[in-house]
C-alpha cells in the first residue's frame, strides 16, 4: 500500500509518521519497519521514536531490533551488509580527482577544452568529477546524445566528457568506486530483491530527492508492504499544475514525479491531507508568508524583528534571550534553535558568548579537519619538499608539537626552544640551505643577545640538526621511490619513527581526562582519515609522485570534517538555514538576515551551466536527465525560509547586523523587509552597549557576562545600577572589584618618582641626539625604548633601515679607502672610482649580516640596485669635486666619551640642588674640511635615503636637533679639526642618496617655450646639499669659487645663487647669519637640558606629535602598548605648526629670555 500524507509547513508531519511507524512496529515486532529521514536529523528522530515507543509500552527503557531510523546512505549499508557481493572500496573525492587528472593527461591531445592547457586546475577537475557523478545518477547515455542539436560550448563539453567518462568508469570497475556507488548498489539490490514485501517504509522531512534517491523510493514503493511518505506543501494539498517560480514548486514536482511512476506502473496509492489544527501563531505567520491568509494582530507578538549594531550584538541578543527565558519562564535549552544563512560568520561570536553565559549548545556546523596539527604538518612537509627549508614552513612544522625529540621531558621546554630558535633564524635571515649550517656560523653577526650565549646556541643547534637531518633523509628516501606502496611505507615509517601516533594518543588521553569528549575524538578521527587517504592513494596511483601524493592528502583533509556528538540532550541547537530541522522547538532565532545572505542564491559555476543542462535535457527526460541542483536550490528559497518560520511554536526572532567586521554598511534581507511589512511588528534595536537604565535588562544574564555592561552604565551620567552591581559583587567579588577599578582607568601614563628615574637612567644620562629627539616625539616611547629597553623582535631583512646602513657603510668605506691609499679624490678617474666602489662592496658583503641577506636571490637584485644608487651619488661627488675646495676628511666620525672628538655635555641643578648631567654622543656621516688662506672651513654631511630638509617647526619642538648639534660639535672641537685654529663652519647638510630621475611629465621639466629641460641635469638637483647654511658670502666664495661669477647658480647648495645686483640670494628658511646660528645653538642646548631634566625627574606623557599628515605613531613599534586613541579626552596629539625663520628666532628669544631684535 502506498500512502501520501500532505500538510502545511506548520503541521508536524514527522510526528504523524513516527506515530504510524511506531504503532505498526508495536503491533507486530516480527516485521521490519524503516523510518527514512535526512541524515542531518537522524539522531533526533531516533530519540523521538524511542520516546514514543517508551510511552506506548509504558516502559522507561526500550530495546528494538526491527525498528530502524536511517538515512538513505545508512539504508544502503543496512541492506548490503549481508549480501553475497564484495562491497567496493569507496574512493575519497580527492583520490577520484587524482584518478581523473591521470585520465585527462593521458587523453589531453584528444580533448577540446583542455588541449592547450599545460596544467588543468584542481577546480576544473572537481567540476568534471561532479559532472560525471551527475551523468551516472541521471542514467544518461553520453553516446546517445546528438551533438548536432547542441551549441558549440555544450558540444565541446560532451565531447570531452564522453572520452573521460568511459575511461573513468572502466578504471573504477576494476577495483574501486566513487562516493555515489552505494546508492547505485542499493538500487540494484532493491530492483532484484524479493524480501521487501513484509517491510514497511516511512519517509519524512523530504521536499526533494536526488535522482538515485528517487529511484530508491520508486522501487521501495513498488515492492514494500507499505510505503508512507509525508510532504509539506503551500496549503497542504497536491497541486498537479505547479510551475517553476511557484512557492512549493520543488516539493510539488517531487510528488508529481512519484505519482507519474505509480500511474505508469499501475500501482494503487492514496493521498491524505493532514487535518487542519487549531489556529496557532506559527500557522498565522505561515499564512501571511505564503499569502494564503491576511494579517492578524497576534503576529506582531509572535515575530520579533531585531536590528543589531553588529554581529556581536546579534549573538548577545540570542544568548541573553535564551538565558532569561530559561531562568524566568521555565524553558529548557533544547526548546531553542538558532539558524543562520552562513553560520561561519558567527563562529567567533556565538560560541564564546554562549559559553560565557554558561548555556549548553550543540553546533552542527562541521568542524573542518584542515586546521588540525597533523594536517598542518602534512601541508608544511609538502612545502618544504617543493620550496626547500623555508623558515615559515620549518617553524610551522616544529610548532605542531607532533615531532618532539625524545630528550625533551615536557612540551613547554620544547616550545620555548622553538620560540628561541625562531628568534635566532629570523634575526640572522636563515632560510633555504642556510638551515643546513650550524648556528655557530651565524653568531659573528652579533645581532641579538643569543649570539653571546654559547650554551643556548648549542641547544638550539641540536634541535635544528634533529629536524633538518630527519627531513633531509625522509625526502631523499621519498623522492627516489617509484612504487606507490614503497613511497607510502616511507611516509608511514617517518610518522611512526618520530612518534606522531603516540603523540596523538597522548592528546586523546589528556582530553578524555579533562572530560572534553569532542576534543578526545579528534586525534583518532584525523589518524583514521589519514589511513583512509593512504589506502585511496594506493588504489589509484600507478607510479609514486611526491607532489601527487601530498596533493591527495591535503585535498582529502580539506574536505574532511570531524564528526560531532552532543554532550547533553538539553542544549540549544545551532544550525544553518536551509538544512532540514526537526520540529518541536518553542523559540527560533534566524540571525544574519542581510541582503547578501538571504535569499541564499547559488552562483558557483559547475562544469555544465544551466543553459547547457537545458539543452541536454530537452526531449530526454523519459530516459534520464541531468539535474540542475543550483537551479532547484534557487527556486526553493521562499519555501525553505517558510520551513524555518514554521519551526517555532512560541516565538520567532529574525535579526540582521547593520555593519560587518570591516565596518561596511549592511542592508536587511528582502525577506526581513517583507516580514516587517506583513506582521507590522515593532523592530527592536539591539545595541552593542546599553544606552540608559531603561535598556539594562536587555543586557543582564549571569554575573560574569553582565558585569561589563553594568560597569559601563555606572560610568554614564544619570544611571543608577549600584544595587545590581552589589548583587554581582556578592557572586564574583574579586573579579567585580578588578573590573570596576579598570573601568575608571585613564589612558594616561604615570610619572616615575625621581628615585625610580635615577635607578633607570642614573644621575648622568649618556645618550645620542636622536634618542633625545624621541623624547620630544613622544616621551612615553622614550621611556619604553631607553628606560625599559623594550625592543621588537629583530629580523634580518633588507628593509629601509638595512638599506640605509648599507648606504652609510659604502660611503664610509669609500672615504676611508681613499685616505688609506693617499689618493686625491679630484685626481681619480671615473674607472678608478668604479674600481674602488667594487672593492668596497666586496668587503662589505663579507660582513655577517649582509652575507646572510645575499643568500636570497631577490636580495641580490636589491643589493645591485643599492649599488647603482651609491655609484650614482659617488660619481656626482666626483663630477663636482673641482667646483669646491672642500674634501671629505672624516667618515662615520664618532664623538663623545672616550672618543677623539669630544661630545656635548650639559649640567644643571635639580630642585634638590643635586647636579645632573647629560652627555651627548653620536656619529657624523661625513665631515668635509678646506684650508684656504690660513682659514680652516668645515661642513657636516648627513646621508638620507629620502629627500629631507631642515624643518624649523620640528626644530622648535625638539624633534630635529641633530644637525644643530653636529654644528656645535664642530665648533667645540676646533683643536681636532683645525689644529687649534678657529674653525669656520659653512653649515650642516643632508645628502639625498638616490638614483631616481625627475618625471618627464613634471611641471618642473617644462620650459616656458614648452621645451623639455635636460633630464640628467634636472635629476642631479635631487643630490644637491640641503640643510643649514651660514649666510657668509666671503666664506661661500672660498668654498665654491664659481659663485664669484655674475648671476652664478650654486652647483652644490640648493637655492643659492647670485642676483643681478651682485648679492647672494640665500634659501629663506635654511640660511642663518653667524649671530643667528649662535641663537640656534643656545636654544639647542636649552632643549637638551630641558629633556634631560624631565627624564631624570621621571616625567612621562603619552603625547605623540602631529605635524601635517605625519605623526610619531606612524612607524612606532609600541602602538599596542600605547593604546592611544585621539577620541579619548585624555589622549591628545602634540600638534606642531609650520613656522618661518622670523617666528623661530622670536620664539627662541622668548624661551631664553633674551632681549633684542634680529
Curated annotation (Swiss-Prot):
Documented EC number(s): 3.1.-.-
What GO biological process terms are annotated to this protein in UniProt?
double-strand break repair via homologous recombination
Query: Which molecular function terms from Gene Ontology are attached?
Result: 5'-3' exonuclease activity; ATP binding; double-stranded DNA binding; helicase activity; hydrolase activity, acting on acid anhydrides
Q: Which UniProt keywords apply?
A: ATP-binding, DNA damage, DNA repair, DNA-binding, Exonuclease, Helicase, Hydrolase, Nuclease, Nucleotide-binding
* Cross-referenced Pfam families: ADDB_N, PDDEXK_1
Q: Which residues form the signal peptide?
A: none
**Highest taxon above the source species:** Bacteria
This protein's cofactor list reads:
Mg(2+)
Q: What does this protein do?
A: The heterodimer acts as both an ATP-dependent DNA helicase and an ATP-dependent, dual-direction single-stranded exonuclease. Recognizes the chi site generating a DNA molecule suitable for the initiation of homologous recombination. This subunit has 5' -> 3' nuclease activity but not helicase activity.
Q: What else is known?
A: Despite having helicase-like domains, this subunit does not have helicase activity.
**Which family would the database say this protein is a member of?**
Belongs to the helicase family. AddB/RexB type 2 subfamily.
- Quaternary structure note: Heterodimer of AddA and RexB.
Q: What's the name of the protein?
A: ATP-dependent helicase/deoxyribonuclease subunit B
This chain's source organism reads Lactobacillus johnsonii (strain CNCM I-12250 / La1 / NCC 533)
Q: What is the lineage of its organism?
A: Bacteria, Bacillati, Bacillota, Bacilli, Lactobacillales
Q: Which gene encodes it?
A: rexB
